[in-house]
């Protein structure tokens, strides 16, 4: 049976107000159509027509929390792939409790977070201040716990870091693309969440989605490397950010294949 890649999937995003414009832009640059809706009177209609859903809890407020839960449940009911980005889940009890409720009742297809965020979800102690993670090494014991967490919940977990780790509990991959400068730009993790939602929405076949997720993680890292290589003397982080989004809009499969640093476990 021929498997067709969906063109220009519609991505519904309920996200934080810090990075909302950047998420819309990376979605367009990676081949998707962004739509941000939170009003309860249109949520059901919007979510049902979407090819993918992203929920980002970076700036929580009561109305948005209700919107997130409504949309996650609809996505679950309709079989629409969904991504949860539990930004700063380790920072407060509210975030932690709400993220766990979303996971339990909304059953996301994928959870993306930095190591501190993912360790919090699996019940480990994290090294962080506020929403920022200072955990930089992923032990084999923690890897195994993450695999078990993914397997038990039938979802994909993406752990972003110096080396990104992706697992669905059965398959696992490590991605070594990227640059330190990406960690100095507000929202690069949130932007990755948008790319991962797109990766899930390109195909209806679940067996193709894991490799698309790995490709999206690697692609984002490669764009960071290329953006840094374009920097000239006295060009700083804002030029780097511009280059990063620019590279995402022009990168092709040939460049990805040449530069990807992916190891499957």
From Swiss-Prot:
Per the record, the pathway is: Cofactor biosynthesis; thiamine diphosphate biosynthesis; 4-methyl-5-(2-phosphoethyl)-thiazole from 5-(2-hydroxyethyl)-4-methylthiazole: step 1/1
Q: Name one GO molecular function term.
A: hydroxyethylthiazole kinase activity
A GO biological-process term = thiamine biosynthetic process
Against InterPro entries, the record matches this protein to: Hyethyz_kinase, Ribokinase-like
Q: Which UniProt keywords apply?
A: ATP-binding, Kinase, Magnesium, Metal-binding, Nucleotide-binding, Thiamine biosynthesis, Transferase
Needed cofactors, names only, are:
Mg(2+)
Q: Which Gene3D superfamilies match?
A: 3.40.1190.20
Q: Name one Pfam family in it.
A: HK
Give residues annotated as binding ATP: 112, 160
- Per UniProt, substrate binds at 36, 187
Main EC class of this protein? transferase
The EC number of this protein is 2.7.1.50
For this protein, what reaction is catalysed?
5-(2-hydroxyethyl)-4-methylthiazole + ATP = 4-methyl-5-(2-phosphooxyethyl)-thiazole + ADP + H(+)
Function, as annotated, reads:
Catalyzes the phosphorylation of the hydroxyl group of 4-methyl-5-beta-hydroxyethylthiazole (THZ).
- HAMAP family linked: Thz_kinase
Q: Which family does it belong to?
A: Belongs to the Thz kinase family.
- The protein, known as: Hydroxyethylthiazole kinase
Q: Which organism is it from?
A: Clostridium perfringens (strain ATCC 13124 / DSM 756 / JCM 1290 / NCIMB 6125 / NCTC 8237 / Type A)
Gene field: thiM
